[in-house]
Amino acid sequence: MSDILDRIIAVKREEVRAAEQSAPLEELRLEASSRDIRDFVGALRAKHTAGLAAVISEVKKASPSKGVLREHFVPAEIARSYEKHGAACLSVLTDVQFFQGSVAYLEEARAACNLPVLRKDFIVDPYQIVEARAMGADAILLIAAALETSQMQDLEALAHSLGLAVLVEVHDHDELMESLTLKTPLIGINNRNLRTFETSIETTIGMLEAIPDDRIVVTESGILSRADVERLRAMDVHTFLVGEAFMRANEPGVELARMFF
């Protein structure tokens, strides 16, 4: 595990302890039960059926490695732009300390469109999954580098019991093998090296042979051009999670359409 990931996980555990005091779990469960769910996996498959790329478009203000990506940051406006220009789903950063995200950003983005929404955060505790459902998320992220296999299995079971889709994220072959023990069809391959922070789409390409046909490969990070998209689609990768390239553009949705459609 990288030093930055170690630090983030330590902060997350502290955040959970504090949140449990201000919003007890049973209170969150009640709130979660009143929320509707949008079909995250179904939205991706609908794009595939239509012969289109399925793009999970990210609402992300900043990152630890790049700093602020977008000064004019209005989540509702960004969400509407993505929906208008063909996004399948949204991914919204809710981590405050490292990515300048917010639960409010997820709520605002989801309210502004009809797309399913992934809570993009560092999940280390069951509390965060119930919390995700309560805030209106339709899917959660599990990062293999941050969790033991048994933890991922338990967290996935809880998420599925609440109606949430699960995207499991891997960085290398060992993590991929662990992720394939889960039930989720969504296998995210992060092209960013956790030690150097460099990105290469070769990471995704190098793992494809090991992934069963019934899984949906989601390529993440480092997809910056139409050429990257065309190369990956030629390798039968049709699901993409993209943030930085869109966030740096004047009009995120227009950049989405330019790169993918």
Curated annotation (Swiss-Prot):
Q: In which pathway does it act?
A: Amino-acid biosynthesis; L-tryptophan biosynthesis; L-tryptophan from chorismate: step 4/5
Q: Which UniProt keywords apply?
A: Amino-acid biosynthesis, Aromatic amino acid biosynthesis, Decarboxylase, Lyase, Tryptophan biosynthesis
Cystine residue pairs: none
The name on file for this protein is Indole-3-glycerol phosphate synthase
Q: State whether keyword Lyase applies.
A: yes
Q: Which gene name belongs to this protein? A: trpC
As recorded in UniProt, its EC number(s) are 4.1.1.48
GO BP annotations, alphabetical order: L-tryptophan biosynthetic process
